[in-house]
Amino acid sequence: MIESFKSQKDMKRQRYQEVYMRSNWRKQMMISALALTLSATNVAPVFASAAPDGKTNAADIAQTMGTTAQWNRWEKEWETLKNDWTQISLSPGSNATELNFAWYTPKQTNDDHSNANVPKLIIGEGHNMKNAKVYEAEQTAVKDEQDNNGETYNSNKVTATGLKENKTYYYSYDNGNGYTKPAEYTTKSTNNFSFAFVGDPQIGSSNELKGKDTKEFYDAQSNAVKSDAFNWSSTLNAALEKTDDQLSFVVSAGDQIQTTKKKLPNKDASKSEIEYTGYLSPEALKSLPVATTVGNHDADNANYTYHFNRTNASELGSNKVVGGDYYFKYGNALFIMLNTQDTNVAEHKQFIEQTVAANKDCKWRIVTLHQDIYGSAEHSNEPEITNLRYQLTPIFEQNDIDAVLTGHDHAYSRSKMLLGGTKANDYTDDEFDAELEKDMDAGENPTTKTVAPGNIKNDSTDEKDQKYLAYLKSIMDEKAIETVKKQGSSVINPEGVLYMTAGSSSGSKYYDLVPRQQTYIAHRWQEDVPTYSVVDVTENSLTINTYRTDNDEKIDETFSITKSKGDTTSLNAEIKASESIVKQKDAYTTESYRVFEQALTGAKEVAADKKATKDEVENALKVLTNAKAGLEKKATTKPATVKKSTAEKKVVVAKASAKLKAGKKKVTVKIKKASVSGYQIKYASNKNFKKAKTRNTRKTIYTIKSLRSKKKCYVKVRAYKIVKGKKIYGSYSKVLKVTVK
C-alpha cells in the first residue's frame, strides 16, 4: 500500500540500494557457500556461476566503425583531460526558450560563502555573439571533495533565457582559467522535433576491479573510463548523424557513471569525478542538452547534483542526497523525470498529478525512470522491480501517460501497449535470488552470453522450482495487454502505456535477456553492442526507431503511436508537418519517398473531401504517419561511387569469396583470406535479405549463432580496407544458402 511506503521510506530506500548492487556479487556468495559446504565433506568443489557480463572494448568498436584514428587521438588526449573536473553539462530548460548549464571551477577562496570571483557565462547569436547576455553563476560548494593536488571546487549553474527557435547561438564560460573558446548551440523547432533516448552510459563500468586505494585500481578505472567514454561519444555521434544534427536533446534513463560512493576507496566522493569527466567529455555534449535520470549508481553521491542543472526540480521523490523528481516541456510534450531510487510512491504520485495538472496543454506525456519495470533482462523479474511496477502503473494510467522510458538492465526491450497490470503473487527477494542462481547457472568456466540459460524446467518436482515458475507466470501480465487498432507499425488512439527499456549506450556492461520472454514484450534485443533510439514527435504521432551504434542498423521495427479524433483537424496538421519533407525529397531513397508522396497525395484528397467518413480520415492519417516513419535517408557515402582522395583512388578491394557450414542452430562462414582490414557478413532468413543482420570481423572464420533450426540462412560477404579512418568496401560475394541444423 502507498501508506505503508511512507512509514517504511528509509528502510525501503536502503533495501533498494542493496538490491540493485546484488547482481555483481550474487554469484560470488553462492560460490563461497558451495565451497564451504563441499570442503566440510572433503569433496572437491565445482565452481559454476552465471555467465559473465559482456562489455565492448573501444578499440574493437573503433575497428568496426572505421574510427581507429579517432581512438588513437583520444587515448593521448585522455591523459591530459582525465584530471580536468571543469567540463560543462547542458540540460533542457523548463521549456524550449531556456537552456541550463552546470560546471565546476576551482575555489578562489576557502570561504564557502564567499562570492568573490563568481564565474559568468556569456551567450549570444551567431559567431559574433550578437545581442549577448551575461549571466552570473549561482554557486554551490562541492562538499567533501578535493582533487589529487588538494584543490577544492565550486559548482556553478546558469539558466539562459529568451532563446529563439531555429537559431544558432555561441556561448563561453569562465572555467577558472579564463573564458573558454565559444561553443555552438542551435535551437530546434518545437512543432516537430526529435530526441534521442539512451540507457546506462555507466562510464567506468568496464573496470572489473573493486574500489581499493591502490594504483592498480586507479589505473584500471582510468582505462575503463577512457574506453567507455569513447564508446559513449560514438553513440552520440551516431545519433546526431542519423538525424542530420536535428536532435533537440537526449533523455538518459540513469546511471551516468559506475562507482557509487559506498564502493569508492575510503568512500571518498571525489574518486568518481574521473568518471564524470569521461561522461562529459564527448564533443557532442557541448551542443546537445541531456535530461538525466537518477540511477542506482548515481544515487548516493551528491556530485550528481553538482554536475547537472535540472529544471523545475522538486523535493518530492528525493532520497535526500541527489534531489527528487523534475520535469520540462518541449513543444507539445511533457517530460516527467522520476527519481525512483526514492521508493515513496505517494510522493511520485503527488508530483505527477501536480505536474500534469499544471501542463494540461501538452498532448504527449512521457515519463522516465531508471528501473525497467516492464523490461526483459536479468533485473526485470526481481520482486523489488515488480513491486515498484504494480504501484506505479496505476498512477501512469490515471494520468494518461503515453510512454515510460527506462534503463537499468542494459538490454533493449519494447512492451506491447499495457493497461491494468495487477500483482498476483507474493514472492520474496531471498526466494527469488536462490532460484535465479540455479536457473541461470552457466556451468564451469562460463563464457559471455546474450540470453541466460533456463535450467529450471516446467516439469520439475522441486516445490521451490514450481513456486519460482508460478511467480514468473504471474508477472507476465498477459491480461494487461491492450487490444489496439493497428495500421502497419502504428497503434491508433491506445488507452494503454508503452514501456521501453534502453540497452547500454556505451557498452560498458551488458546483461543477459531472461530465458523466458515475458508475454508483455513485443520485441527485445541483446547482442552486446551499444544502442540508441531516436524518437520523433509531431502533433499527432510519436515514432520510435532504435539502432545499434556500430553499423546504424535498426534492431526493431519502426513503432508509432498515433492520436486522432477522426476529424480533419489532426489530418491537416500532419499534412502541414509533412510539407517540409517535400522540400528535402532528394535526401531520401526513391522508393521510400514514392510511398510517402502517394500517402501525402491521398491524405490531401481525403482532407479536401467534405464527405469523407471518420474511418477514411483516420486511415489516411495512419497511412501518412507510417509513410513518414518509413522514409529512408540516402547514404551519405556510397562505397562504389564515393568521391575519393588521391590516396583512396588507388585502393582496390577484391570481391570476397566464402563457404558455409551448417551446425546446430548456427552457421559457420569461412572466408577466403585477402589482404584487407576486415570483412562484413550480411545474413537473413530470406533471399531478399529483408530484416538482414550485419556482422563485422577481422577473422576469416566467423560463426553466426542463435539461429532457428531447419530454417534457411542466406549469407553474403564483402571485404573492406580502412584508409584514413574510412572504410572502402569491395563487392559482395554471391549469395550463399544453407539449412540450419
Give names to the regions the model predicted:
Residues 565-644:
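Beta-rich interaction/scaffold domains
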Residues 148-152, 693-698:
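Short beta-strand segments within Ig-like beta-sandwich modules, predominantly Fibronectin type-III
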Residues 40-59:
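Sec-dependent signal peptide cleavage junction
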Residues 60-293, 299-321, 350-354, 385-399:
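Divalent metal-dependent phosphoesterase catalytic cores across multiple superfamilies
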Residues 154-160, 165-187, 210, 215-222, ...:
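Extended active-site neighborhood of metal-dependent phosphoesterases/phosphodiesterases
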Residues 166-167, 704-725:
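Beta-strand-rich modules
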Residues 75-99, 642-675, 727-741:
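Pro/Thr/Ser/Gly-rich low-complexity, intrinsically disordered linker/stalk tracts
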Residues 117-129, 675-694:
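Extracellular low-complexity, O-glycosylation-prone stalks/linkers
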